[in-house]
């Protein structure tokens, strides 16, 4: 192995420089404030949903089991990236250790893949609830929900494991500058001085499987849902069904479309400058919006949150 190459098999680079917006110093403070507020809102909102789903008996249905897992994923998702981003924006040393970078993209890909499958499971739940209401309790039983969630976590881990094993073996040469806010596999692969065709191909295949297949299931489920909703004679019933589903579709769009742009375009056309801003959609914007999207139009969740706040108030009083 050449002495100027660094890899998992030899000397690994000590650290990566995360460029972020350091080339635009005027943007760092406003972005720092936005990210900090978004992170606080994401933490508060998702913790509230998890607590309400756990302690309120009215929210022990499959829909809220999936929602509480989605909120937990979003908590972990934002905590994996945002604190590091905030530290770098407030410091002149915008670095992350090689080990820290590896852990970050490993966990990030694990959680991202898991969330793709959880969102598909939520679409399946809504399909059964609206299109097969008489069989809902039999089909969407608690054991099945737990199995789907376990499948999501295990699949996400498998995807992440493959990506990490392939990426840590790449040699890196020269100055290790990542034109991104945090470590992601496409950006790290871009720094390698070796031929990354195998990495690019496997990344595209895995992302296509774990992103496009769940997305196809979601769109198929909502196609059947739309057809069933249009048959509902009650305008109130149609409005309630569309309200629940539209919030889910908005989250799906904000999460999947940027991910597809980032991970499924040819490496030759991949723009790190555009990609680092697009990655903010699924790393912070979607996790921040999720609690509000799922509660503002959901009477059961709003009622549960009010009861939770009342209980906390009594305990504090």
Curated annotation (Swiss-Prot):
<keyword id="KW-0552">Olfaction</keyword>
<dbReference type="GO" id="GO:0004984">
    <property type="term" value="F:olfactory receptor activity"/>
</dbReference>
<feature type="topological domain" description="Extracellular">
    <location>
        <begin position="163"/>
        <end position="199"/>
    </location>
</feature>
<keyword id="KW-1133">Transmembrane helix</keyword>
<feature type="transmembrane region" description="Helical; Name=2">
    <location>
        <begin position="62"/>
        <end position="83"/>
    </location>
</feature>
<feature type="transmembrane region" description="Helical; Name=6">
    <location>
        <begin position="241"/>
        <end position="263"/>
    </location>
</feature>
<feature type="topological domain" description="Cytoplasmic">
    <location>
        <begin position="224"/>
        <end position="240"/>
    </location>
</feature>
<keyword id="KW-0675">Receptor</keyword>
<feature type="glycosylation site" description="N-linked (GlcNAc...) asparagine">
    <location>
        <position position="199"/>
    </location>
</feature>
<keyword id="KW-0297">G-protein coupled receptor</keyword>
<dbReference type="GO" id="GO:0050911">
    <property type="term" value="P:detection of chemical stimulus involved in sensory perception of smell"/>
</dbReference>
<feature type="topological domain" description="Cytoplasmic">
    <location>
        <begin position="297"/>
        <end position="317"/>
    </location>
</feature>
<dbReference type="InterPro" id="IPR000725">
    <property type="entry name" value="Olfact_rcpt"/>
</dbReference>
<feature type="topological domain" description="Extracellular">
    <location>
        <begin position="1"/>
        <end position="29"/>
    </location>
</feature>
<keyword id="KW-0325">Glycoprotein</keyword>
<keyword id="KW-0812">Transmembrane</keyword>
<feature type="topological domain" description="Extracellular">
    <location>
        <begin position="84"/>
        <end position="104"/>
    </location>
</feature>
<protein>
    <recommendedName>
        <fullName>Olfactory receptor 2B11</fullName>
    </recommendedName>
</protein>
<comment type="function">
    <text>Odorant receptor.</text>
</comment>
<dbReference type="Pfam" id="PF13853">
    <property type="entry name" value="7tm_4"/>
</dbReference>
<dbReference type="GO" id="GO:0005886">
    <property type="term" value="C:plasma membrane"/>
</dbReference>
<keyword id="KW-0716">Sensory transduction</keyword>
<dbReference type="InterPro" id="IPR000276">
    <property type="entry name" value="GPCR_Rhodpsn"/>
</dbReference>
<feature type="glycosylation site" description="N-linked (GlcNAc...) asparagine">
    <location>
        <position position="5"/>
    </location>
</feature>
<keyword id="KW-1003">Cell membrane</keyword>
<feature type="topological domain" description="Cytoplasmic">
    <location>
        <begin position="54"/>
        <end position="61"/>
    </location>
</feature>
<feature type="transmembrane region" description="Helical; Name=3">
    <location>
        <begin position="105"/>
        <end position="124"/>
    </location>
</feature>
<feature type="transmembrane region" description="Helical; Name=7">
    <location>
        <begin position="277"/>
        <end position="296"/>
    </location>
</feature>
<feature type="transmembrane region" description="Helical; Name=1">
    <location>
        <begin position="30"/>
        <end position="53"/>
    </location>
</feature>
<feature type="transmembrane region" description="Helical; Name=4">
    <location>
        <begin position="144"/>
        <end position="162"/>
    </location>
</feature>
<dbReference type="GO" id="GO:0004930">
    <property type="term" value="F:G protein-coupled receptor activity"/>
</dbReference>
<keyword id="KW-0472">Membrane</keyword>
<feature type="topological domain" description="Extracellular">
    <location>
        <begin position="264"/>
        <end position="276"/>
    </location>
</feature>
<feature type="transmembrane region" description="Helical; Name=5">
    <location>
        <begin position="200"/>
        <end position="223"/>
    </location>
</feature>
<keyword id="KW-0807">Transducer</keyword>
<keyword id="KW-1015">Disulfide bond</keyword>
<feature type="disulfide bond">
    <location>
        <begin position="101"/>
        <end position="193"/>
    </location>
</feature>
<feature type="topological domain" description="Cytoplasmic">
    <location>
        <begin position="125"/>
        <end position="143"/>
    </location>
</feature>
<comment type="similarity">
    <text>Belongs to the G-protein coupled receptor 1 family.</text>
</comment>
<dbReference type="InterPro" id="IPR017452">
    <property type="entry name" value="GPCR_Rhodpsn_7TM"/>
</dbReference>
């Amino acid at each position: 192995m050449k002495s100027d190459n660094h890899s998992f098999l030899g000397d690994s680079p000590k650290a990566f420089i995360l460029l972020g917006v350091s080339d635009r110093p005027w943007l760092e403070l406003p972005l720092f404030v936005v990210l900090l507020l978004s992170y606080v809102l994401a933490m508060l909102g998702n913790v509230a949903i998890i607590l309400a789903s756990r302690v309120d008996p009215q929210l022990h249905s499959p829909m809220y089991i999936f929602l509480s897992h989605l909120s937990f994923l979003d908590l972990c998702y934002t905590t994996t990236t945002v604190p590091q981003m905030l530290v770098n924006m407030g410091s002149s040393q915008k670095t992350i250790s090689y080990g820290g970078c590896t852990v970050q993209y490993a966990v990030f890909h694990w959680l991202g893949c898991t969330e793709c499958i959880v969102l598909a499971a939520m679409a399946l739940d809504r399909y059964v609830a609206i299109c097969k209401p008489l069989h809902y309790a039999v089909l969407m039983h608690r054991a099945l929900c737990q199995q789907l969630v376990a499948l999501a976590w295990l699949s996400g881990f498998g995807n992440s494991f493959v990506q990490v094993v392939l990426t840590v073996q790449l040699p890196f040469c020269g100055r290790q500058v990542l034109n991104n806010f945090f470590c992601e596999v496409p950006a790290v692969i871009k720094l390698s001085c070796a031929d990354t065709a195998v990495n690019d191909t496997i990344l595209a295949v895995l992302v296509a499987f774990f992103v496009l297949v769940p997305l196809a299931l979601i769109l198929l489920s909502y196609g059947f849902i739309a057809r069933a909703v249009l048959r509902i004679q009650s305008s109130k019933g149609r409005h309630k069904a569309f309200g629940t589903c539209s919030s889910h579709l908005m989250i799906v769009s904000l999460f999947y479309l940027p991910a597809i742009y980032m991970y499924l375009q040819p490496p030759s056309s991949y723009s790190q400058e555009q990609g680092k801003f697009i990655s903010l959609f699924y790393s912070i914007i979607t996790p921040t919006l999720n609690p509000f999207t799922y509660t503002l139009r959901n009477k059961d969740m709003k009622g549960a949150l009010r009861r939770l706040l009342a209980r906390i108030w009594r305990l504090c009083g």
